[in-house]
Amino acid sequence: MHMPKGFLSFGINIGIKDDTKDFGVIYSEIPCKATAVFTKNNFPGAPVIVGKEHVRSGVLQAIVINSKNSNVATGEKGIQNSREICKIIGESLDIKETLVLPSSTGVIGVPLKMEIILPACKKAKSLLKPGNLEEVAEAIMTTDTRKKISSRNIKTKSGQGTIYGIAKGAGMIEPNMATMLCYILSDVSLPEGTDLYSILKSSVDQSFNCLTIDSDTSTSDTVALLCNGLSGESSVQDFSKALTEICIDLTKLIATDGEGATKLIELTISGAKSEAQARKIGKSILNSPLVKTAIYGGDPNWGRLIMAVGKVFDEPIPFEGLQIYFGTLPVKEANPETLKKLSEYLKNNTEISLNVVLNVGTISMKFWGCDFTEKYIEENAYYTT
């Protein structure tokens, strides 16, 4: 997997909670054109507050991330701590603190262990290495069971460039910007005047904002995009296509790694009258505990799907025209033989294709989620104990 030119990084353990990696830094040798989208939760974490201020200029050069503690609901002190982290990282890397994007993920309401984090910040420069982004992908994990990485190579005027994305997320996932963190790094540039935010927002709306694990929107969601341009200029069309593909890859990896999940669900809503209608109904289906547990248990209980469509009160769908399929098998009013095949399909596959045809329009959208198992409860009932 190709790495973008000019980015150095590291991921290490500094003992925030246990002996797994919990601290990472990404640094570009030159300032990057940058943009980001953040959580819409009304109680954003301190790093989100500071990060919004720093990305406003459209230029970033470094990202500093800690896991195992989100620095959320920590008051003014938490904001001061995020600023101090950026300041010390800036001093270590010899860049302005406003060129540093802070991120934190983990337990809410617990002050950061600054006595551990600041010494790590001070020695950041000495730890940086090229081609080391997989370490960061590991360092940002909390309840994740695997690293989440995707990349694409794209043509540039001078040859070839790379877009490389890493993400974390397994629970408290229903992004709306946009716990989910994603950092996308590229060594390409785009034509002067290109609206980088609009490009990122479009990709996020087609991917992360179509994802739900448990319907809880994190206080820390962040998707950041940094482009240093060292491999030359690409077309907006090629860049946008590759960026969206990466975001969808990472979205599916997050859904597959949902806390306790055994099955990835890819839901297609088609025949909708609008994107808003498709989004409401798609999220209603994938957020339904009854639907998610039925898929886990291999129970083709199509009444639960009818319920999930029907409970979107402001988007009534005529029952007669509604069609529902698992794979290619029709679900609605299925006979005993089809129900048996449906149960086998659900039990024997780890990737479930669910298609809901509304037949009221021409809009089609994809959404991603996962099943709901006993292990999700085990994971979250004792998270801080």
UniProtKB/Swiss-Prot annotation:
Annotated site, Involved in the stabilization of negative charge on the oxyanion by the formation of the oxyanion hole, chain positions: 105-106
Gene Ontology biological process terms from the UniProt entry: L-arginine biosynthetic process; ornithine biosynthetic process
Site (Cleavage): 178-179
Protein keywords: Acyltransferase, Amino-acid biosynthesis, Arginine biosynthesis, Autocatalytic cleavage, Cytoplasm, Multifunctional enzyme, Transferase
InterPro entries assigned: Arg_biosynth_ArgJ, ArgJ-like_dom_sf, ArgJ_beta_C
First-tier enzyme category under EC: transferase
Record's GO cellular component terms: cytoplasm
Coiled coil ranges: none
PANTHER family tied to this protein: ARGININE BIOSYNTHESIS BIFUNCTIONAL PROTEIN ARGJ, ARGININE BIOSYNTHESIS BIFUNCTIONAL PROTEIN ARGJ, MITOCHONDRIAL
This protein's name: Arginine biosynthesis bifunctional protein ArgJ
Originating species: Leptospira interrogans serogroup Icterohaemorrhagiae serovar copenhageni (strain Fiocruz L1-130)
Annotated gene: argJ
